[in-house]
């Protein structure tokens, strides 16, 4: 008789491009987002939590490829009784949902509408080292104001946010540019062909990777990339490419010099002059608020996303050095970007609604804080009340209740209490600072044993026998003094 086939078991593994987050990481992110929300709230922004799912129609141009709605996003088509239904997708960012929310509820919302949003977004793109298909974003936007004061405020708020979470002044800079200035440069170049203009924009977007010489080559005939492959250029002459390079390299020693260089780059272009005037206005507003060039600067080399924004753009760059995976020094780089996009709601209402906002890369900012030592890499676990007699579980629950009521994180060991060594191993794996022990003898004498697990580990690793005798890591105290002694040990550990 043939043996019945075993039911195949599913593989216990995360899908490609996704990962799990455990205790300390989740706590660190939560605490950082709480600090950021505090800054946003202080600036008068209100929280918004929108659906993780939107219709593909609502996502619209925010998708990388509108002709293939399931490309770049996680999308599916609803089935209806009368046939195929709407295409739905997990949100690609937090901006597209804002456009839909404002268009849908604009009659009930104040104008301008100032909102912040935090949460995961999903992108169906090829994953790589440090690049996941689900990640957190933290956005703040002002919808309904065309004033440059809104842009200046976003820049100031971004600066305050970085300092609040632990990036000191001098270790970051918020850099500001304007898409209109680039439009003026393109106008000066006399590029009428839309395809060629788009090619120039894509080339400029690579400035931070290939530098001035690389952009010059890509604007011309082309260049060899790092792999040796030849990348075709835009095909501009040196004279045509000149204004672009002048624009990218126009930052001077101070704001006045930068502005003068930009005016030379845009010539008589009205749109270019308007963009420069807006930059000057933003600079004046920031200076009035006490935000000097040690925090926020006008920098025409900020070019990422210029094809998307319609006016001012800004980027927060961390300037301190770290070591990459090959041991080479490099700057940490950008952790946030944003800008003005005045066609945000137009696709829903047919009316242009001005808007400006910023998005913080949560995981990158967390990584930066770890590099600066601003976040504990290992979170302290709970105090563990061990179980010496399973029939006395009520007594142990009373102990843990006293600790919790005193504001101390604590738990009773709920595994098999037969092996006391396993209980201490559990406490070690939880990174617990203290273990509480009460066996039959302690119960009879009205005392408890309190073990300082942090000090005990340090003594075991470094102390001599004499030092170990002089510095005991286990204390016997009266049962009534349990909370006071635990609090004392935790305070000493906190230093």
UniProtKB/Swiss-Prot annotation:
Catalytic activity: tRNA(His) + L-histidine + ATP = L-histidyl-tRNA(His) + AMP + diphosphate + H(+)
Keyword Iron: no
Enzyme class of the recorded protein, top EC level: ligase
Record Pfam families: HGTP_anticodon, tRNA-synt_His
CC terms in the record's Gene Ontology section: cytoplasm
Gene Ontology molecular function: any one: ATP binding
Localization terms from the record: Cytoplasm
Primary location group: cytoplasm
Family affiliation: Belongs to the class-II aminoacyl-tRNA synthetase family.
Subunit structure, interactors included: Homodimer.
Protein name (database record): Histidine--tRNA ligase
Species annotation: Ruegeria pomeroyi (strain ATCC 700808 / DSM 15171 / DSS-3)
Gene designation per UniProt: hisS
């Amino acid at each position: 008789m043939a043996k019945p086939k075993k039911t195949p078991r599913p593989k216990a593994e995360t899908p490609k491009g996704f990962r799990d987050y455990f205790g300390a990481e989740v706590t660190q992110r939560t605490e950082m987002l709480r600090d950021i929300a505090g800054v946003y709230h202080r600036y008068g922004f209100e929280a918004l939590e929108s659906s993780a799912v939107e219709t593909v129609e609502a996502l619209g141009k925010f998708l990388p490829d509108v002709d293939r709605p399931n490309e770049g996003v996680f999308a599916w088509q609803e089935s209806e009784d009368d046939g195929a239904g709407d295409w739905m997708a997990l949100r690609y960012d937090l901006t597209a949902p804002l456009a839909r929310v404002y268009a849908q509820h604009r009659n009930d919302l104040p104008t301008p509408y100032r909102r912040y949003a935090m949460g995961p977004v999903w992108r169906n793109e090829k994953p790589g080292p440090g690049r996941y298909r689900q990640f957190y974003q933290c956005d703040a936007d002002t919808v309904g104001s065309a004033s440059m004061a809104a842009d200046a405020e976003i820049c100031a708020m971004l600066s305050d946010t970085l300092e609040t979470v632990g990036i000191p002044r001098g270790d970051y800079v918020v850099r500001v540019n304007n898409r209109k200035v680039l439009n003026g440069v393109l106008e000066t170049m006399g590029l009428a062909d839309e395809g060629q203009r788009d090619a120039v924009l894509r080339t400029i977007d690579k400035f931070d990777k290939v530098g001035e010489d690389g952009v010059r080559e890509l604007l011309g005939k082309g260049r060899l990339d790092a792999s040796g492959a030849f990348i075709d250029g835009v095909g501009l002459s040196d004279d045509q490419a000149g204004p672009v390079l002048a624009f990218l390299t126009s930052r001077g020693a101070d704001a006045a010099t930068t502005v003068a260089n930009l005016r030379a780059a845009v010539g008589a272009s009205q749109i270019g002059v308007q963009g420069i005037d807006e930059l000057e206005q933003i600079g004046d507003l920031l200076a009035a608020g006490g935000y000097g060039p040690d925090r926020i600067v006008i920098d025409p080399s900020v070019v990422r996303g210029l094809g998307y924004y319609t006016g001012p753009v800004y980027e927060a760059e961390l300037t301190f050095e770290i070591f990459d995976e090959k041991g080479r020094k490099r700057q940490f780089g950008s952790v946030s970007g944003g800008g003005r996009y005045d066609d945000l709601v137009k696709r829903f209402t047919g009316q242009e609604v001005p808007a400006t906002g910023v998005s913080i890369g949560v995981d990158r900012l967390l990584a930066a804080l770890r590099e600066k030592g601003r976040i504990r890499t290992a979170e302290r676990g709970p105090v563990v009340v061990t179980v010496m007699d399973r029939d006395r579980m009520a007594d142990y629950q009373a102990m843990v209740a006293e600790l919790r009521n005193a504001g101390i994180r604590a738990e009773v060991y709920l595994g098999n209490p037969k092996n006391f060594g396993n209980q201490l191993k559990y406490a070690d794996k939880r990174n617990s600072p203290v273990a509480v022990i009460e066996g039959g003898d302690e119960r009879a004498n009205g005392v408890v044993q309190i073990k300082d697990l942090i000090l005990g580990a340090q003594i075991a690793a470094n102390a001599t026998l004499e030092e170990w005798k002089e510095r005991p890591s286990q204390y016997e105290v009266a049962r009534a003094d349990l909370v006071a002694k635990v609090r004392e040990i935790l305070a000493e550990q906190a230093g």
